[in-house]
Amino acid sequence: MKIKKTAGRQAAPNRINELITGISEVRLNGLDGEPLGLMTIREAQELADEAGVDLVEISPNAEPPVCRIMDYGKFLFDKAKSQKEQKKKQKIVQVKEIKFRPGTDENDYQVKLRNLNRFLDDGDKAKVTLRFRGREMAHQSLGMNLLNRIKDDLAEIAVVESFPKMEGRQAVMVLAPKKK
């Protein structure tokens, strides 16, 4: 038996037409899926030829194997099209980070809040990092108040996934968009 090379192509998952061998009898389904009963493989191939379509082995492990009369090219096209549609609908959620400081001014705060709003509207998670430097570590309560203010300002569109906590010299909070 000669082994076929499939240069990058995937072999057909179903045997079709003359490739269905080693079987004497099959259970056949018609074009619309209606059962046509048991018949020999030769009769099934003749029916498929008369209809101008392919004989496709659907369930090779059944006893007797199940075959169907269908346009195999159209079947593969529709299958590939539906897989593309499913892939298109998948959304990869990213975690976007915005960095604040305890002394962030009101204007800068509003700009960063707008960016957080945009990230959450796009369906991404947002990581809010508040960095403390030097003596600011003595006033961590100011930083926690700022994180709580952010949480309150975004309460309508975001849910807190991980509450503010200290990690070394920075406080971190993760926000996730609310389900619609």
UniProtKB/Swiss-Prot annotation:
Gene3D superfamilies: Translation initiation factor 3 (IF-3), C-terminal domain, Translation initiation factor 3 (IF-3), N-terminal domain. Keywords: Cytoplasm, Initiation factor, Protein biosynthesis. It is found in: Cytoplasm. GO terms for biological process: ribosome disassembly. SUPFAM superfamilies: Translation initiation factor IF3, C-terminal domain, Translation initiation factor IF3, N-terminal domain. GO terms for cellular component: cytosol; membrane. GO terms for molecular function: ribosome binding; translation initiation factor activity. Belongs to the IF-3 family. Monomer. HAMAP family: IF_3. IF-3 binds to the 30S ribosomal subunit and shifts the equilibrium between 70S ribosomes and their 50S and 30S subunits in favor of the free subunits, thus enhancing the availability of 30S subunits on which protein synthesis initiation begins. This is Translation initiation factor IF-3.
